[in-house]
Design a protein with these regions (language model features):
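Internal transmembrane alpha-helix with an interfacial aromatic "cap," most often the third helix
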Residues: 28-38, 67-74, 91-116, 122-137, ...
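Short aromatic-rich membrane-water interface segments that cap or initiate transmembrane helices
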Residues: 7-13, 81-96, 248-260
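C-terminal transmembrane-bundle signature of multipass membrane proteins
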Residues: 21-33, 177-291
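Helix-loop junctions on the outward
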Residues: 43, 61-89, 155
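Extracellular-loop-to-transmembrane junctions of the mid-late helices
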Residues: 156-186
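Membrane-interfacial loop-to-transmembrane alpha-helix junctions, especially the N-terminal start
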Residues: 43-58, 126-141, 190-200
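Aromatic-anchored segments of alpha-helical transmembrane domains
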Residues: 59-65, 141-153, 203-212
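Hydrophobic transmembrane alpha-helical segments in integral membrane proteins
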Residues: 2-27
Length: 291
C-alpha cells in the first residue's frame, strides 16, 4: 500500500473526527441557546423543541460514534481493530441514530400540520392538506423502520438487494416529506418560505441522488454478485459474523467509494438535525399568509 494512499485514508478519518467534535459543540451551543430563550416559547412549542433537541442528540452522538469507528458494513471493513468497530455495534448505533433523525422530521410535520389546522381558515381544501400532512408524519417512522429492517437484512446476509429496498424507501420518505412541505406552502409565513424552499430543494436533490445514483449502485452490486455466484449468509450466520469478524484496512481503494456519502452524512445531515431543533414557528396566521 502506497504512503500517499495511506495518508489519504488517515486524513479523511481525521476530518471525520474533527467534524464529530464540531458537531457536539454545535449541539451544545444550540441547547444553550434554546434554554436561554425558553420563556419565549408557548408550552407546546417548547415541548416540541425539547423533543427535537433530544432526538438530535441521538443523531449527533450516533454519527460521532461512527466517525470515530468507521465501518464498511457488507465488506466488514474497519479502520480500528476493536470490538467498538464491529459491524454489530456500528449498525445498531446507526439504526438508533437514523430513527431519531426520522422522528425529528415526523415531529416537525406533526407540529406544522397542527399549526395549519389551528390557523387556516376552515375550508375543505385546507382541512384536506393538514390531514394529508398529519398522515405523512405518522407514516414516516414506520416506513423508516421497514427500511432499517432491510438494511439489517443486507448487512447480515451480505446481499445488496436489501439495500436496494432500503434506499428506495428512504427516497420515498423524502419525496413524501417534500410533497408535505409543498402542500403547506400557501399557509407558511412569508418570511419562512425561503427556509421551506431550501428544505424542498435539498429533499428533491436527495430523492434524485437516491433514484439515479444510490439505488442503481446497489442494484448493480447485487447483479454482479448474482452473476459471480456469490454465496450469501443466512441471517443467523450473519449475526455471528457481524459480531465476531472485522477486517482492518487503511487502503484508500477500499474506502474511496464511501468517502463522499459518509462525509456528507456525518456533517451536513447532522447540521440539519441540529437546525431542526431551532426551527421557528412556520405557519402564519390566516391574515399574514401570502399566496
Amino acid at each position: 500500500m502506497g504512503e500517499d494512499a495511506l495518508a489519504n485514508t488517515l486524513a479523511w478519518w481525521t476530518l471525520l473526527r474533527g467534524i464529530a467534535v464540531f458537531n457536539v459543540l454545535a449541539w451544545s451551543l444550540a441547547a444553550w441557546w434554546l434554554w436561554r430563550l425558553r420563556d419565549r416559547w408557548p408550552p407546546d412549542a417548547w415541548m416540541n423543541r425539547r423533543w427535537q433537541l433530544a432526538l438530535s442528540a441521538g443523531y449527533v452522538l450516533g454519527c460521532g460514534y461512527r466517525s470515530l469507528w468507521p465501518v464498511f458494513d457488507v465488506q466488514r471493513l474497519v479502520l480500528v481493530d476493536s470490538f467498538l468497530s464491529s459491524v454489530l455495534l456500528g449498525r445498531s448505533v446507526a439504526t438508533v441514530a437514523e430513527m431519531c433523525f426520522a422522528a425529528q422530521w415526523a415531529l416537525l410535520l406533526r407540529e406544522m400540520s397542527r399549526e395549519m389546522s389551528r390557523e387556516a381558515s376552515r375550508t375543505e381544501q385546507h382541512d384536506r392538506c393538514s390531514a394529508a400532512v398529519a398522515a405523512v408524519s405518522r407514516l414516516l417512522l414506520p416506513t423508516v423502520a421497514v427500511a432499517e429492517a432491510f438494511s439489517w437484512y443486507s448487512v447480515l446476509t451480505t446481499s445488496n438487494l436489501g439495500h436496494v429496498v432500503e434506499e428506495s424507501l428512504w427516497g420515498l420518505s423524502a419525496a413524501a416529506l417534500v410533497a408535505s412541505l409543498l402542500l403547506m406552502w400557501p399557509r407558511v409565513h412569508f418570511h419562512r418560505r425561503p427556509l421551506i424552499a431550501l428544505w424542498c430543494a435539498a429533499g428533491a436533490a436527495y430523492v434524485m441522488y437516491m433514484g439515479f445514483v444510490d439505488v442503481p449502485m446497489y442494484w448493480a452490486r447485487w447483479a454482479d454478485d448474482e452473476a459471480s455466484g456469490r454465496h450469501y449468509l443466512t441471517p443467523a450466520q450473519g449475526l455471528v459474523d457481524v459480531s465476531m469478524r472485522w477486517v482492518v484496512s487503511h487502503q484508500w481503494a477500499h474506502w474511496r467509494g464511501e468517502v463522499v456519502w459518509m462525509t456528507a452524512y456525518f456533517s451536513v445531515a447532522v447540521w440539519l438535525s441540529i437546525a431542526l431543533a431551532l426551527v421557528p414557528r412556520t405557519v402564519a396566521p390566516s391574515t399574514d399568509a401570502k399566496a
